Amino acid sequence: MGTKAKAHIILLPRWFAAPLFGAPIVLGALLAGGMSFTSWIGLLAGLLVMAGGHSLNSALDYAWTGLDRGGGTERSAEKSYTTAQNLIAKGILSVKSVYVNGLCWYLLASIPLVYLALRVGYAVLIVGFAGMSITFLYAKAKFNWTHELVLGLAVGPLAVLSGMYATSGSPPWKSGLLASVPFAIITSFAGLALDEWPDAKANLAKGVKSIAYKVWENGVSLEWYLSSWLLFSYMYQIFLINIGILHPSSAVSFALWPFFIGSMVFLRTHFKKASGAFVAAGIAYVIFIVLGHALG
């Protein structure tokens, strides 16, 4: 596979994040009655929306917000888990081709979404198109203090609701909203501070405003910040189990606590490897919640 083909098909969509978006979709389907044929179609649609959103975000962060533009230390840094943010700056892809890439993923996602709308109900179409719009809100959210909220909305409520409405025309959506919180916490409220840590100096010079960047700017301990959100997520998970939304078996995710702690211990000395390990633990966390609930 050529460099450009790999960039378009593998790197821009950021498939490593598929579990972070896919797990809440599956949980939504389970809460709405269980996985069915339309649930799997909904999962496919959700992942295609994710791919398009990631691709368009790369173009927007270069051409619109300018965060990925400039020299090596003046733009977003490459991470151990993704290098897609620098494909345009390095001249591997053009801005136009990245826009086209993102729109093609969205066009592909529209096919299963329309099918689900005709088969299950039109609510899934509304949720799906709302998910597509998130990437444009997210690009500017980094400049108006809604950074975590916008991404949290995408990987939390919208993802869970998409799984629900792909499964049933009248799902228990209130339970879905409550169940979506841990997914929003791990990927957005905790994850963004980690993801933006190496970008903070360059992006703050361009005017970004979000809590994730302030963690770095104000010298707040990243380890303390991450562990605080993790502790809240685990406590909230206990709440969901107690009120009967999650099955007690979903507590298998607690087994990952030592891995989170271990990765944070090495953040100061081996940031790139440790951050990759934290992301891997976060991916396992959302998978364990869903698997535990499904098998319980």
Segments from the language model and where they lie:
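Small-residue-rich segments of transmembrane alpha-helices in multi-pass membrane proteins
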Residues: 19-28, 150-165, 213-217, 275-293
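Topogenic membrane-insertion module of multi-pass membrane proteins
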Residues: 1-60, 70, 130-159, 169
